[in-house]
Curated annotation (Swiss-Prot):
GO terms for cellular component: cytoplasm. It comes from Methylibium petroleiphilum (strain ATCC BAA-1232 / LMG 22953 / PM1). It comes from the Bacteria. One of its GO terms (biological process) is arginyl-tRNA aminoacylation. Coiled coil: none annotated. This is Arginine--tRNA ligase. InterPro entries: aa-tRNA-synth_I_CS (IPR001412), Arg-tRNA-ligase (IPR001278), Arg-tRNA-synth_N (IPR005148), Arg-tRNA-synth_N_sf (IPR036695), ArgRS_core (IPR035684), DALR_anticod-bd (IPR008909), Rossmann-like_a/b/a_fold (IPR014729), tRNAsynth_Ia_anticodon-bd (IPR009080). The keyword Acetylation does not apply.
Length: 561
């Protein structure tokens, strides 16, 4: 059916070019909201009516006439009908829809994937300060970022996952001071406890390991504590390494890996920040005022010019960001996606302005951004605000411990990134169709159970399903399920292009719903072996697509529940 869809799309494009050679609209099919309206819908006649100054129903008939002359339409389509003001409803032949089952079974885990290309993308996400455990906002970033990486990989891209460590800011000094205070026997609330210190129990854990002169490994680096409470620089280095290690453990528990870790401090150590500022000054894109160095960001659409270097000689926080993205470009990544919290919205214009002003060939609009809003955690009907481990927020590890990795990943991807999300812990633990991840995973487990029953009760061999007589699949619920399977590749490519992994979650819920309706309507272990085999082939194809889609989200597909 994938081949049929491709050929029909070409036929539609040719027919539109015939009707409107000077301004043909983009050829596209839509999915009717009701099955009674056909399998695919075409709205092109209504789009063309105004520019061509013709009645949309007359145009629809002309388009149908043009389509019916195409060989692909004759091969794959049963009927074309005009509806309403100018819709065209397209009904596929049963044999067309049945092909999707064989296509899925033949492709397996590759169904929906495109051939490998030379395209390269770098996706930066999480990028937490190494000052504490990962919170639920970092969890949303991790789920979104990893799913976007997997989406691009399904489209044949080579993807690099990068974590940027902000290890050169004021907060690192606060971390060191907090740990030193613990080493001095102080605790939150005591006289002498730093006003801006981190209060979580993890600070006491860092202090204890520092006194014990332990060695921690973070990424590819090791650091051994000196055990000296007066060694503030040693405390700083150990605390950063300790928390980087802890964050790595959190990400491992979440099933997220990174290919590369980039340190903000390296931008200063290698002179990249100074070099970037030098390029901007040499290009005449800066000016001095009030003892500070300013960047002319208004030349690139920003609402006002921005300070780059303050009068005390320190850089504002967007300057290393500009240097970092110049580095990404120089590494050959011309497709870069940043996953960040919505509080970073104000930095986008100035970073892009700095990249344009640097005049190194970076195009406008580089990099792409996906900004996500906050996550609120509810448990027992009340908002959870504080974690003992973190001291002031709910951690990602808390959620994983409470509900499991699969629930956390699916839930955090189940809404558009730019909407606030309420994570209901109680809902995530429910074992019914109210819980979206359970609903989808249960569909897969249910299919596996039916196939096991077939093997045990009727000595069925799953290897024979690829040879099933698919002509037996004519029930309305079967047609609905096959059409939903056929929509998977198009959905994947659209989700990748739009940076919208929530589309995958929406699709999987719809697919699970189509399966559950089918399960309720039909029997699968019948007295007719050919019918049973055909239906089980459809179930096996459905299970495969469920597995493929869940894998994109980093969620498992259990055989039993």
């Amino acid at each position: 059916m994938i081949r049929a869809q491709q050929e029909l799309l070409v036929a539609l494009g040719d027919a539109l070019a015939e009707l409107a050679p000077e301004q043909p609209p983009i050829a596209a099919f839509e999915s009717p909201k009701q099955a009674a309206h056909g399998d695919l819908a075409i709205t092109s006649a209504m789009q063309l009516a105004k520019p061509l100054k013709r009645n949309p129903r007359e145009l629809a008939q002309a388009l149908i006439d043009a389509l019916q002359r195409r060989e692909a339409v004759q091969r794959w389509v049963a009927a074309l009908e005009i509806a309403g003001p100018g819709f065209i409803n397209l009904r596929l032949k049963d044999t067309t829809k049945q092909q999707i089952v064989a296509e899925v079974l033949a492709s397996g885990t590759d169904f929906g994937r495109q051939p490998a290309t030379s395209e390269r993308a770098l996706v930066e996400f999480v990028s937490a300060n190494p000052t504490g455990p990962l919170h639920v906002g970092h969890g949303r970033q991790a789920a979104l970022g990893d799913a976007i990486c997997k989406l691009f990989e399904t489209q044949g891209w080579q993807v690099t996952r990068e974590f940027y460590y902000n290890d050169a800011g004021v907060q690192i000094g606060t971390l060191a001071a907090s740990t030193q205070a613990r080493l001095q026997g102080l605790k939150p609330g005591d006289a002498g406890w730093p006003e801006s210190a981190y209060n979580g129990d993890y600070i006491a854990d860092i202090a204890a390991d520092f006194l014990a002169r332990k060695t921690v490994k973070a990424d590819d680096r090791e650091f051994t504590a000196s055990g000296d409470p007066a060694d503030l620089d040693g405390i700083r280095q150990f605390a950063v390494a300790y928390l980087r290690h802890e964050q790595d453990l959190d990400l491992q528990a979440f099933g997220v890996r990174f290919d590369h870790y980039f340190l903000e401090s390296s931008l200063y150590a290698t002179g990249r920040v100074e070099a970037t500022v030098g390029k901007l000054v040499a290009a005449g894109k800066t000016f001095e005022d009030g003892g500070a160095l300013w960047l002319r960001t208004t030349d690139y659409g920003d609402d006002k010019d921005r300070v780059m270097k303050k009068s005390d000689g320190s850089y504002t926080y967007f300057v290393p960001d500009v240097a970092y993205h110049v580095n990404k470009w120089e590494r050959g990544y011309h497709k870069v996606i940043n996953i960040q919290g919505s509080d970073h919205h104000g930095t986008i214009a100035r970073v892009r302005a700095g990249l344009q002003a640097a005049d190194v060939g970076i195009p406008a609009g580089y990099p792409d951004y996906v900004l996500h809003k906050m996550v609120t955690v509810m448990r027992g009907g009340e908002e959870v605000k504080i974690s003992k481990r973190a001291g002031s927020y709910v951690t990602l590890r808390d959620l994983i411990d409470w509900t499991g990795k699969d629930a956390v990943r699916f839930f955090l991807i189940s809404r558009k990134a730019d909407t606030e999300f309420v994570f209901d812990v109680d809902l995530a633990l429910k074992k019914n169709d109210e819980n979206p991840v359970y609903y989808v995973q249960y569909a897969h487990a249910r299919i596996c159970s039916v196939i096991v029953q077939w093997r045990e009760q009727q000595a069925g061999d799953p290897a024979t399903l690829a040879q099933a007589d698919l002509a037996r699949l004519v029930a309305p619920t079967e047609a609905a399920l096959m059409l939903k399977l056929a929509a998977y590749p198009v959905m994947l490519s659209g989700a990748a292009e739009s940076l919208a992994p929530h589309d995958v979650a929406f699709y999987l819920r719809d697919l699970a719903g189509a399966f559950h309706s089918y399960y309720a309507a039909e029997r699968f272990l019948t007295d007719d072996p050919a019918l049973s085999r055909a239906r089980l082939a459809l179930l096996a194809a459905t299970a495969q697509v469920l597995r493929n889609g869940l894998a994109v989200l980093g969620v498992s597909a259990p055989d039993r529940m």
